[in-house]
Curated annotation (Swiss-Prot):
It is found in: Nucleus. Gene3D superfamilies: Cysteine proteinases, Zinc/RING finger domain, C3HC4 (zinc finger). One of its GO terms (biological process) is protein homotetramerization. Zn(2+) 1 binds at C21, H23, C113, C116. It comes from Xenopus tropicalis. Its main location: nucleus. SUPFAM superfamilies: Cysteine proteinases, RING/U-box. Belongs to the peptidase C19 family. USP16 subfamily. This is Ubiquitin carboxyl-terminal hydrolase 16.
């Protein structure tokens, strides 16, 4: 009995049946390409090579090596459109009977169709994928042979040159002077910057690109050398409540395994004479911190960078905390020591080299338009994730209601990313696939109904939230204070997501669809939300306000999921709210959600609701209280949280949103990093569902109601203005361009070129009271020294690095190590040469080639 061929075909065959590019069949000729690439130089444009031979260029003239594109019809090798000659584009424009529109970049291994003017994912076509695999194998084999030959010649030349120098020195100088010069030259050579390739351990290009940029950050090596020094005195500021203000500890323990592996890697990159380094030890330590990187799968460079920095940060904080406990054990009790160490970790007063180099601070300013009360929310960051807007998204959203289904499918094919509905079945799919798609659609609808049902049940908490916890009344009542203002989160990532999840878990428990253990596990996980490098909202100080804003947390699902995943192996965020006004008295309310969780696990199911409600009620402050200093702290079950400071200030509303320099003259032309920063820091208006819960206006209305003998209290929501600016710039500024976007089940990558400058002025995006800036300075300049580029699509791609080889910035190192800020900032970037590194392949490039790359991560260092 013969089986039907189409019945058990895999899902990938349905993708191959409909290639992205409709010109693929006529524009691809495997035989001609293989014949044309016999005994030729792959990485050189054949027309430029012929022109150079005719012109006989001199050796002192620097000729740029542009990117080479291979015609997949005839095997022609031409330079790209970013070069001066554009031989590949001219080859396509030459009239022929058959199109030569399909080309392949031999540097990035990405296919492009000139007719479609779009990238072609070669993994969706068996013919194109097999040809690209064949070319990659041939290119690797050829590069290994040429690299080994070139390496032998370089080694021989170095040996001859060293022997000649030794002979001349021995003849001209005395013996003692020659020995001293030899030792000093060896030391100078070890600190001289170098560029080396990295071995690909198996789909680890995302890791290699990050390590290349970190290896060209000289301050990292200086800080690691200092951290490796044992018995080094470290001064740790203690909380204000303790008797001593500072404590000096001596670090007698070695740094953690990840920190040591990083130090060994940077030392090998700087001192080894090998052309290629294998970063196996560092990668294995990262995999131990975050098991998601195991298995040699394609990963994200920005996530790898965050896991790496957070891992080293957590190890250093743990080492300093142990030294603190040991130094205080002779003067304080064990319980007091634990409290001090825990409070220091929560307030982020424990010094560590990661925060010193990459850490900065953002300030979100919120002003009520009714009473003009100004509140500030301070939060730290390690990198800035900038939104990348694309006109394709706006166009598709505007045409969703009017365009029919066939036109939508045509738009998806012409788009520059991969977009596919998860519940969509192809027209030629089998009955099994169609049935599977229907089940997925039903499951999605069921989940949506359950979410709506859960949101409806959480409204019941508003009545419970009005009651005061007895413990909090005893602690707050003596001072009769009240917090000034609360904010409702807008459509960005909210810091109250963990508390919203607690209320959702309570509704699930009422419905009987979830156990206590699973609910509390998700509560402790969701409250550990990492807010570094992402937009976060102000601290929620009222349980009723949190309940009413659960429906506003659905827009940035990708960032929330991404951030939650980062909490597996690193320190996580906590919130510290501080309201400072005229009265100097202070009260503190501490809520430990992990301790509450442990207590709830011991309770029965009947007492679960009451305990969880009490934990939520602790966030609601008494309405009888005058404004003083109030602190709300949620202590996570992690080593080192990121801290947020909420304060209400008396400031002139006219200067509340002032910046370090004017924003009017910014060149916001097209798609650029300046446009992304402007969008990230633009002033918003909180209206509608995002209105501000202002306690000042609420207190005024409550006083009027009391005069009219109406006992029921109502909360006042007002329109407000909000702006997020940089208040403490980091020495190393890392910018993450969010090219990968997810809207529901739609996945896409924005392949559009984003302009980025060599010198970036961050002053228009900083507050007027920015820290660590000389007095009277109106500029904050950063110099570009590293770029991570991603080429490819959502489903497959390749990460490469551009690094600037330069001498270390001594002023920046002194600022990071000693905290010395020079009075005058630098105005010109340091001299250096740029290199493009793709795993083990290193190539010198020009600055124009760097600025034309498709950047995903940008590394800037402060100019001092």
């Amino acid at each position: 009995m013969v089986k039907k061929r189409g019945k058990n075909l895999p899902a990938q065959d349905s993708l191959d049946a409909e290639p992205v590019c409709k010109h693929l069949r006529k524009a691809l000729d495997e035989g001609s390409v293989k014949k044309a690439l016999v005994n030729v130089e792959w990485t050189v444009c054949q027309e430029c090579q012929a022109d150079n031979k005719e012109k006989n260029n001199s050796d002192d003239e620097l000729v740029e090596d542009p990117s080479v594109w291979l015609c997949l019809k005839c095997g022609h090798r031409g330079c790209g459109r970013n070069s001066a000659s554009q031989h590949a584009l001219n080859h396509y424009n030459t009239p022929r009977s058959e199109p030569h529109c399909l080309v392949l970049s031999v540097d990035m291994w990405s296919a492009w169709c000139y007719l479609c003017d779009n990238e072609v994912p070669y993994n969706r076509s068996s013919r194109l994928g097999q040809l690209v695999d064949y070319l990659q194998r041939k290119a690797k084999a050829k590069s290994k042979s040429t690299d080994s030959a070139a390496l032998d010649e370089e080694v021989k030349a170095e040996i001859v040159a060293e022997n000649e120098v030794k002979i001349e020195d021995q003849e001209e100088k005395p013996k003692g002077q020659a020995k001293w010069d030899k030792a000093s030259s060896t030391q100078n050579n070890s600190t001289e910057p170098t560029v080396k390739g990295l071995s690909n351990l198996g789909n680890t290009c995302f890791f290699n690109a990050v390590m290349q940029n970190l290896s060209q950050t000289p301050a990292v090596r200086e800080l690691l050398n200092e951290a490796k020094t044992l018995k080094k005195p470290v001064t740790v500021p203690l909380p204000d409540s303790s008797s001593p203000t500072n404590v000096e500890v001596h670090l007698e323990q070695q740094p953690g395994p990840l920190t040591l592996a990083m130090w060994q890697f940077l030392t090998e990159m700087q001192e080894t004479k090998k052309g290629v380094v294998t970063p196996k030890e560092v990668f294995s330590q990262v995999c131990k911190k975050a098991i998601r990187f195991k298995g040699y799968q394609q990963q994200d460079s920005q996530e790898l960078l965050r896991y790496l920095l957070d891992g080293m940060r957590g190890e250093e904080i743990q080492r300093v905390s142990l030294a603190m406990s040991k130094s205080l054990q002779n003067t304080l009790d064990e319980e007091e020591i634990k409290k001090i160490v825990k409070d220091s970790e929560k307030r982020r007063t424990i010094p560590n080299f990661v925060d010193h180099l990459f850490g900065g601070e953002l300030t979100s300013t919120i002003m009520c338009e009714e009473c003009h009360t100004v509140s500030l929310v301070h939060e730290p960051f390690l990198d800035l994730s900038l939104p990348v807007l694309d006109d394709v998204i706006v166009k598709k959203n505007s045409q969703k209601s009017s365009a029919p289904a066939p036109e939508r499918k045509e738009e998806e094919e012409n788009d520059d990313g991969y977009i596919k509905e998860r519940d969509e079945a192809s027209p030629g799919a089998s009955k099994h696939l169609q049935k599977k798609a229907k089940k997925a659609a039903k499951k999605q609808a069921k989940n949506q109904r359950r979410q709506l049902k859960m949101q409806g049940k959480t409204v019941l908490l508003t009545d419970v939230a009005k009651q005061e916890c007895s413990e909090d009344e005893e602690e707050i009542a003596p001072n009769n204070t009240e917090s000034e203002a609360n904010t409702r989160p807008d459509d960005e990532v909210p810091i109250a997501d963990g508390l919203n999840t607690m209320k959702s878990d309570l509704s699930a428990l009422e419905n009987g669809s979830e156990t206590i253990e699973s609910a509390m596990e998700r509560v402790t996980e969701d409250t550990d939300l990492d807010t570094s490098g992402h937009n976060t909202e102000s601290v929620e100080m009222n349980a009723m306000e949190l309940v009413r804003n659960m429906e506003n947390n659905n827009n940035n699902n990708t960032d929330v999921n991404k951030t939650l995943e980062r909490t597996e192996g690193s320190g996580v965020d906590s919130m510290e709210a501080t309201a400072a006004v005229d009265n100097g008295n202070a009260d503190t309310v501490c809520v430990d959600d992990t301790e509450a969780a442990n207590g709830l696990l011991d309770c029965s199911a009947a007492s679960m609701d009451n305990e969880l409600t009490n934990s939520l009620n602790r966030l609601k402050l008494s309405s009888d209280i005058e404004p003083t200093q109030v602190e709300i702290e949620i202590l996570p079950d992690q080593q080192q949280p990121h801290t947020q400071i909420y304060e209400v200030i008396n400031e002139d509303p006219k200067t509340a949103f002032s910046t370090l320099s004017e924003r009017k003259d910014l060149p916001l032309d097209g798609y650029s990093v300046l446009s992304c920063l402007y969008q990230f820091t633009h002033k918003e208006t909180l209206t509608g569902n995002n209105k501000l819960l202002c306690n000042v206006c609420t207190r005024k209305q409550a006083s009027r109601l009391n005069n009219s003998n109406k006992g029921e209290k109502t909360f006042v929501y007002t329109n407000a203005k909000k702006q997020m600016l940089v208040s403490d710039p980091s020495p190393i500024l890392t910018l993450h361009l969010k090219r990968f976007q997810q809207n529901g089940f739609n996945l896409r990558k924005i392949n559009r070129h984003i302009k980025f400058p060599e010198v970036l002025d961050l002053a228009p995006f900083c507050t007027s009271k920015c820290k660590n800036i000389p007095a009277g300075e109106s500029r904050l300049l950063y110099s570009l020294y590293g770029v991570i580029e991603h080429s490819g699509s959502m489903r497959s791609g390749h990460y490469t690095a551009f690094v600037k080889l330069r001498r270390p910035n001594q002023q920046l190192c002194e600022m990071v190590l000693k905290g010395v800020i020079p009075e005058v900032s630098g105005s010109e970037p340091g001299q250096g040469s740029w290199y493009h590194i793709s795993d083990s392949h290193v190539q010198a490039v020009s600055l124009s080639r760097v600025l034309s790359s498709q950047a995903y991560l940008l590394f800037y260092e402060r100019m001092l």
